Amino acid sequence: HATIRRQRQMCIRDSNKVKPNTYKVIKDHPRLIIPFYDTTGKIFAFQGRAFGKEQPKYLTIKLDENKQKVYGLDKVNFQQPIYITEGPIDSLFIDNCLAAGGADLFLKNKIPNENITYIFDNEPRNKEIVKRMYKVIEQDFNVVIWPEDLQLKDVNDMIMSGLTKLELQDIISNNTYSKLSALTKLKYWKKIKEV
């Protein structure tokens, strides 16, 4: 754990020196620094998340360009069912959860698709999210399709509104679909005509 502690200190102390002249300097905003660890506990990337409406919302620096940007690899048990959220903060509220874009490619052949459940943001009018939901369903992954009466945008908003972790897990469990049932549910959930 001393190695991890040293890596965390390096992340905080030298975040602006890791890859000099690689990233354009933009207007500075306060950001939460989120370290990404691999399965051995070694940092391979870190991400700065804006607190307000600043754009870009996320700035990511990868120390190893060959690794996919997947958060939570150091904590997940690949022998158990895995959840995948869009963002690292959402993943903190769900047991055995990763956060990633394109994680389906990363996890191929590691565990069966039916043991992976994607949890996208609750945005039925977002064409990109709906398109990604169709893609993971076609690849035989499970997907959470939020109930229509739930008006909160993402897992973090749900927790901030007062839902407990257990209540959130119940909602996720009761609204996880796959294959034909997922396609049918998604057809009625989405609020856009074409994808």
Residue map of PLM features:
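A short acidic-Thr-Gly-centered motif at the start of a beta-strand
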Residues: K24-I26, K69-F78
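Single conserved hydrophobic/aromatic residue that forms the stacking wall/gate
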Residues: H1-I12
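Short coil/loop residues immediately preceding or within conserved phosphate-binding loops
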Residues: Q7, R31, Q79
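A short, polar/charged loop-to-alpha-helix boundary motif
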Residues: G52-L63
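A short, hydrophobic, proline-anchored segment that marks a local hinge/packing element in signaling
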Residues: R31-Y37
